[in-house]
A protein has these predicted regions:
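Structured helix-beta-strand junction loops
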Residues: 21, 44-45, 76-77, 103, ...
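Flexible, glycine- and charge-enriched loops at secondary-structure boundaries
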Residues: 21-25, 143
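A short, polar/charged loop-to-alpha-helix boundary motif
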Residues: 4-18
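EAL-family c-di-GMP phosphodiesterase catalytic domain
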Residues: 5-8, 81-88, 106, 110-195
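A general structural detector for well-ordered alpha-helical segments in enzyme core domains, enriched
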Residues: 35, 62-69, 92-100, 118-121, ...
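Sensory/regulatory domains in signal-transduction proteins
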Residues: 1-6, 54-58
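Catalytic core of bacterial c-di-GMP phosphodiesterases, primarily the EAL and HD-GYP domains
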Residues: 25-95, 105, 168
Length: 195
C-alpha cells in the first residue's frame, strides 16, 4: 500500500487543510502520480494499493497524461482503495470506475465496519477487496462481539465474491483467529512495518 507521509502535518491535518480550501483534487492527483513514480523507482512488481477519495477523480486530461506516462506497465497492477469519506460524487465515481476497470485494475473499500463504508457501499462500488477496519480487529481474539461481527462480515463479503483484508493485525493471537474465520489477506505490525 502506498502511504502518504507529509513532513510537517499528519495525514488527517493535511486532508482537513485541503478539504477546507476545496483542493482535495490536488491530493488525489499527487497521490496517483507520486505513488506510481515511487513504485517504479523502487522496482516493485506486485500490485500497489493507492488511496483515493470517493468524491474526486483524476480529470480526463490528467488521466491521459497518467496513462501515457505509465502506460501498460501499470495494467493490472493497481488497486484503487476507496477511503472512508463522508462525501461521494456519482459523476466522479462513474469516471473513476470506467478508467480503472479499463486497465484491468482493482478496487478495494477501506475501513469497512466503521459506519460510512458498509454493505451499502459494497453493493454500490462492487469492490474486489474489502479491508476490515482496525477497530474490528484489535484484540478480536479476546472479544466475542468482535468475533461474531467479523465472522459474519467475512461470510457475507465472501458470498459477494469479495476478498477480505484484516487491517491492523498486531499480534499472533489476532492473526491466528482471523485465519481461522477465513480472512484472505492481512496487514499490520505483526507482519511488517511500513518502509
Amino acid at each position: 500500500e502506498a502511504l502518504m507521509r507529509p513532513k510537517d502535518l499528519t495525514v488527517t491535518d493535511l486532508i482537513a487543510k485541503y478539504q477546507g480550501a476545496d483542493k482535495l483534487h490536488i491530493i488525489e492527483v499527487a497521490t496517483f502520480f507520486g505513488a506510481m513514480q515511487a513504485y517504479f523507482m523502487r522496482g516493485y512488481t506486485e500490485r500497489v494499493a493507492i488511496n483515493s477519495f470517493p468524491s474526486d477523480c483524476i480529470e480526463p486530461d490528467e488521466a491521459q497524461v497518467f496513462w501515457e506516462y505509465f502506460g501498460d506497465d501499470i495494467r493490472g497492477r493497481m488497486i484503487i482503495e476507496i477511503l472512508e469519506y463522508p462525501y461521494f460524487s456519482l459523476d466522479h465515481w462513474i469516471e473513476k470506475n470506467r478508467s480503472v476497470r479499463s486497465m484491468n485494475n482493482l478496487f478495494s473499500l477501506d475501513d469497512y465496519g466503521t459506519g460510512i463504508n458498509d454493505m451499502e457501499k459494497v453493493d454500490f462500488i462492487k469492490p474486489d477487496i474489502v479491508k476490515l477496519d482496525r477497530s474490528m480487529i484489535s484484540e478480536i481474539d479476546k472479544d466475542p462481539e468482535k468475533q461474531a461481527k467479523c465472522k459474519e462480515s467475512i461470510a457475507i463479503l465472501h458470498d459477494y465474491g469479495v476478498k477480505v483484508v484484516a487491517e491492523g493485525v498486531e499480534t499472533k493471537e489476532e492473526f491466528d483467529y482471523l485465519v481461522s474465520i477465513g480472512a484472505d489477506y492481512f496487514q499490520g505490525y505483526y507482519l511488517a512495518r511500513p518502509s
